[in-house]
């Protein structure tokens, strides 16, 4: 089994992790109400998914 000959330096370790940064969530505009929502999910503002009302909201 391969064993490291030298301790990996902090610089080399951090260079390797340069591309591991997290990005924000991908958002899409709801065609019904123009609110931002997660793609492939029901819009939490209006309850529509693929031009159909999936959730019912109570009127106050």
Swiss-Prot record:
What does the entry list under GO cellular component? large ribosomal subunit
Which biological process annotations from GO are given for this protein?
translation
Q: Where is this region: Disordered?
A: 1-20
Gene that specifies this protein:
rpmF
Q: Which UniProt keywords apply?
A: Ribonucleoprotein, Ribosomal protein
Has the keyword Membrane been applied to this entry?
no
Q: Where is the composition biased (Basic residues)?
A: 1-19
Family of the protein in this entry:
Belongs to the bacterial ribosomal protein bL32 family.
Species, as recorded? Syntrophobacter fumaroxidans (strain DSM 10017 / MPOB)
Q: Which HAMAP family match?
A: Ribosomal_bL32
InterPro entries assigned? Ribosomal_bL32, Ribosomal_bL32_bact, Ribosomal_zn-bd
Q: Which molecular function term from Gene Ontology is one that the record holds? A: structural constituent of ribosome
Name of the featured protein = Large ribosomal subunit protein bL32
Origin: domain of life: Bacteria
């Amino acid at each position: 089994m391969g064993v490291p000959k030298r301790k990996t330096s902090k610089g080399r370790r951090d260079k390797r992790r340069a591309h591991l940064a997290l990005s924000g969530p991908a958002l899409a505009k709801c065609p019904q109400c123009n609110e931002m929502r997660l793609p492939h999910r029901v819009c939490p503002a209006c309850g529509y998914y693929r031009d159909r009302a999936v959730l019912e909201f109570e009127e106050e």
